[in-house]
Amino acid sequence: VTCFCKRPVCDSGETQIGYCRLGNTFYRLCCRQ
């Protein structure tokens, strides 16, 4: 499983499992099998 912090949304085929915070910006934690 590979996970990335992305914004504004996850790519198709990815599942959001949480959030990342980098500085004052929130990202979606997106994982793909």
UniProtKB/Swiss-Prot annotation:
Q: Which positions form S-S bridges?
A: C3-C31, C5-C20, C10-C30
Q: Which family does the record assign?
A: Belongs to the alpha-defensin family.
Species name = Mesocricetus auratus (Golden hamster)
Q: Name one GO biological process term.
A: killing of cells of another organism
The superkingdom listed in its UniProt entry is Eukaryota
The GO cellular component terms are: extracellular region
Query: What is known about what this protein does?
Result: Bactericidal activity, greater against Gram-positive bacteria. Low anti-fungi activity.
InterPro entries in the record: Alpha-defensin_C (IPR006081)
Q: Where in the cell is it found?
A: Secreted
Task: Work out whether the entry's keyword set contains Secreted.
Answer: yes
Q: Mainly resides where? A: secreted
The organism's taxonomy opens as: Eukaryota, Metazoa, Chordata, Craniata, Vertebrata
Q: What is this protein called?
A: Neutrophil defensin 4
Mod. after translation: HANP-2 could be a product of proteolytic N-terminal amino acid removal from HANP-4.
- One Pfam annotation reads Defensin_1
Q: Which UniProt keywords apply?
A: Antibiotic, Antimicrobial, Defensin, Disulfide bond, Fungicide, Secreted
